[in-house]
């Protein structure tokens, strides 16, 4: 027998998790480490630091890794250290006292779905503002003690880490997360195995492992497809945030929406409200429709129940920012659902189209979310108005300002983003109930009682803290990128805490106009190099790997930062993450934001700055439209002067230069006699904290969601579900009847032409007699009066309802006494609409007939 040179079978690897053992006295630390409460609790973070400060830095402030890597000798030393053990017991008591508070049963329960969550820098399942907002929301839900759970993804690679080449080119690096070293837990089934959710895709299943993140009292469930049960084509579904092609995107959104609901069902969780944070999660409503139909309800009855309990929050201000799928791709994965729902394919795909009968139109997740959610909201007052216009084509019988799209302005989680130094100032000077009453401006006004010197010293301490962080973290990166050690030393020497320090840190999308400051380099050079009034700019942020223009902006800023006149004055900090963000929003003097109007949906980084006495300089867009107060920051005008964007950019740049030269730097450097600081600047800081900060906390945002949406939706949903869904069935039947007869409803008689003789001071009585075709008072009439402006600039003058004055069989007579109080040219038309007190708003059943 010939001996082979190689002979081996394949090993069957078994995953074995060997945990580092802790002495029983320290076992409680593992419990704290696996709850992100530690991340917004100073006492817990400080405790982990003191266990082994050098190691805690080395593991990136990851307490799970810290406990794993603590040496045996160090563990023994901790147990013997009475003072340290006393701190361990005190922090654990704080934690247990916090966790033992029961949720407020009076407030509706919520299931919250989002593609990303920014909870801390250790758990890399976020990319930008959407994730930051969602993470802060869960933390505040915990602090506010509400009954909420959330669903997202456990990304193997998360969002990329950023570095810059020597010429400033962005390099994206994807590091695999080692799940066992993260502050997360496996969700176990009844047999003690990790729970698996089987998610149906056309003709096959995707198997998702379920993980749990403890966010204080809140549970966040994360789905993970990177396992051996799935094919090589499906394992990458949860590899990267916003990674892959459109096919991977639809697979992600099926997993989040449909898989998310199946996960909650398997866990036995049912909530009052289902909140889709962006359109990515819209298919959760599809699975809920299927569940109700499976229980024996018709599609229309199921839709009443799903809509009543669904809220969709949009974060995107332009239609191009939403997800659209070609019909062929959508059909590939969703072809089985019409049969499950008892409707046709055209009816099904039509729910994701603005024009359902247009077969060339792609399926839009945001449109589907609108059509399956009772309520919709933008994320600032301005963005609410932008969203009304954006979604107006869905309800063609109504003008944008008439539709039901509302808003809740974003806020930020105060304990996460407020530096410890400021929290001490607030604790010493504000009321004891401050944290439970964060929106009370009267409490914040106590900042005026804090001595100016204490305010200034707090600011200087945080500026120096930022500079130390930069020197510690970035020196090696700069040596690598810039080659010349002398240049790096020069940069470090020029970072002066006494300079006016300005931050511009955010996602590098072109609409955010990071280039604006560099429109006139000569003028900028004079500003940053004024020996009496030195100014320093910090830039940081990532561009999407597919966004060449955004990467070009980063490269250009880096190139400018290397010019001799800007060296150490314009500084780009790589790999913007939560840790760096916390240092910047508390460590600079001014937070600058220059988006193209009105493309900033909200923007929360400036709100974080407000909590830390950092003053905003921003275009009046997003949250700053509401937040700006004179004497508490600076604003560029909300209205555009030029339609030509290049001209507008030049004007805005000139405005920024002028503000810096003539207002901001003189104010900052005008030291009060006998002081080392400007009392006038401190006054601006105090005004900012007292009058702006109270209105932009996550506490206020959460309370707004309850008062504006959750409470009323939960109340209505409960009524629809009562008595075997009686009201839901009643409303569905009524809508079906109205829809069936709508086209046959007609005008028998009217005197609409009497409007031709309308004059001011005289009442004109209009009368319409309608044959309702046996519907029994199911329609309403109103006169819509528009100001006579160009067709593309609709401006409602007034809307006047008709009164029902006579009923005779199927004939209903409506009357309106029209008092023409204003002279001028107007456009008038009569609108007929379905009328039912059980409807939450008109767009819930947006049938309209103009009685021309």
Segments predicted by a language model, with ranges:
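Catalytic cores of carbohydrate-active enzymes across secretory and cytosolic contexts
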Residues: 1-852
């Amino acid at each position: 027998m010939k001996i082979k040179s190689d002979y081996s079978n394949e090993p069957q690897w078994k995953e074995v998790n060997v945990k580092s053992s802790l002495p029983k006295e320290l076992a409680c630390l593992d419990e704290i480490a696996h709850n992100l409460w530690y991340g917004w609790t100073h006492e817990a973070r400080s405790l982990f630091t003191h266990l082994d400060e050098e190691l805690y830095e080395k593991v990136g402030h990851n307490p799970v890794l810290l406990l794993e890597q603590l040496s045996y000798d160090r563990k023994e030393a901790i147990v013997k250290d009475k003072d340290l053990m006393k701190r361990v017991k005190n922090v654990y008591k704080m934690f247990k006292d916090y966790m033992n508070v029961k949720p407020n049963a009076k407030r509706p329960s919520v299931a919250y779905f989002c593609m990303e969550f920014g909870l801390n820098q250790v758990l890399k399942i976020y990319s930008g503002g959407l994730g930051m907002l969602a993470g802060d929301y869960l933390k505040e839900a915990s602090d506010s003690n509400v009954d909420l759970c959330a669903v997202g993804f456990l990304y193997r690679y998360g969002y990329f880490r950023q570095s810059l080449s020597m010429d400033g080119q962005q390099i994206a690096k994807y590091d695999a997360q080692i799940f066992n070293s993260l502050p997360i837990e496996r969700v176990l089934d009844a047999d003690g195995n990790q729970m698996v959710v089987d998610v149906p895709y056309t003709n096959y299943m995707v198997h998702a492992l379920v993980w749990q993140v403890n966010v204080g009292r809140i549970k966040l469930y994360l789905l993970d497809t990177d396992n051996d049960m799935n094919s090589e084509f499906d394992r990458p579904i949860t590899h990267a945030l916003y990674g892959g092609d459109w096919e991977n995107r639809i697979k992600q959104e099926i997993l989040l929406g449909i898989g998310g609901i199946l996960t909650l069902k398997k866990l036995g969780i049912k909530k009052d409200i289902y909140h889709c944070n962006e359109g990515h999660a819209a298919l959760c409503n599809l699975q809920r429709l299927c569940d109700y139909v499976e229980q024996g309800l018709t599609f229309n009855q199921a839709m009443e129940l799903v809509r009543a309990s669904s809220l969709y929050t949009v974060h995107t201000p332009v239609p191009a920012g939403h997800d659209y799928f070609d019909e062929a791709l959508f059909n590939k994965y969703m072809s089985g659902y019409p049969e499950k729902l008892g409707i046709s394919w055209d009816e099904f795909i039509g729910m994701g189209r603005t024009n359902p009968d247009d077969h060339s139109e792609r399926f839009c997740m945001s449109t589907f979310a609108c059509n399956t959610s009772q309520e919709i909201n933008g994320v600032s007052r301005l963005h609410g108005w932008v969203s009304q216009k954006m979604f107006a084509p869905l309800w063609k019988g109504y003008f944008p300002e008439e539709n039901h799209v509302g808003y809740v302005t974003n806020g930020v989680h105060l304990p996460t983003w407020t530096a410890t130094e400021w929290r001490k100032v607030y604790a010493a000077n504000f009321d004891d109930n401050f944290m439970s009453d964060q929106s009370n401006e009267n409490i914040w006004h106590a900042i005026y009682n804090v001595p100016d010197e204490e305010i200034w010293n707090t600011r200087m301490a945080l500026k120096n803290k930022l500079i130390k962080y930069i020197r510690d973290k970035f020196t090696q990166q700069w040596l690598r990128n810039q080659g010349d050690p002398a240049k790096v030393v020069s940069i470090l020497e020029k970072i002066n805490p006494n300079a006016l320090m300005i931050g511009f840190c955010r996602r590098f999308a072109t609409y955010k106009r990071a280039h604006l400051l560099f429109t006139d380099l000569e003028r900028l050079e004079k500003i940053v190099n004024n020996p009496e009034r030195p100014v320093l700019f910090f830039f940081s942020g990532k561009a999407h790997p597919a966004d060449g223009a955004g990467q070009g902006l980063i490269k250009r800023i880096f190139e400018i930062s290397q010019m001799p006149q800007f060296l150490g004055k314009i500084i780009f900090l790589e790999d913007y993450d939560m840790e760096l963000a916390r240092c910047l929003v508390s460590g600079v003097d001014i937070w600058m934001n220059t988006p193209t109007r009105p493309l900033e949906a909200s923007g929360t980084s400036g709100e974080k700055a407000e909590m830390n006495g950092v003053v905003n300089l921003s275009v009046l867009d997003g949250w700053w439209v509401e937040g700006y107060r004179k004497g508490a920051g600076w604003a560029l005008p909300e209205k555009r002067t030029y339609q030509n964007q290049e001209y507008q950019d030049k004007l805005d740049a000139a405005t920024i230069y002028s503000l810096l030269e003539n207002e901001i730097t003189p104010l900052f450097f005008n030291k009060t006699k006998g002081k080392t600081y400007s009392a006038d600047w401190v006054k601006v800081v105090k005004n900012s904290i007292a009058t702006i900060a109270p209105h932009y906390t996550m506490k206020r945002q959460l309370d707004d969601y309850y008062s504006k949406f959750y409470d009323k939706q939960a109340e209505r949903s409960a009524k629809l579900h009562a008595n075997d869904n009686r009201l839901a069935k009643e409303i569905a039947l009524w809508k079906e009847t109205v829809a069936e007869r709508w086209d046959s409803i007609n005008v028998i008689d009217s005197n609409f032409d009497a409007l031709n003789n309308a004059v001011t001071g005289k009442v004109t009585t209009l009368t319409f007699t309608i044959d309702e075709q046996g519907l029994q008072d199911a329609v309403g009439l109103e006169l819509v009066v528009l100001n006579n402006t160009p067709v593309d600039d609709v401006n409602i003058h007034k809307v006047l309802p008709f009164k029902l004055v006579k009923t005779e069989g199927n004939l209903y007579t409506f009357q309106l006494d029209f008092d023409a109080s204003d002279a001028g040219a107007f456009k008038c038309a009569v609108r007929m609409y379905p009328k039912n007190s059980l409807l939450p708003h008109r767009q819930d059943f947006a049938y309209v007939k103009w009685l021309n």
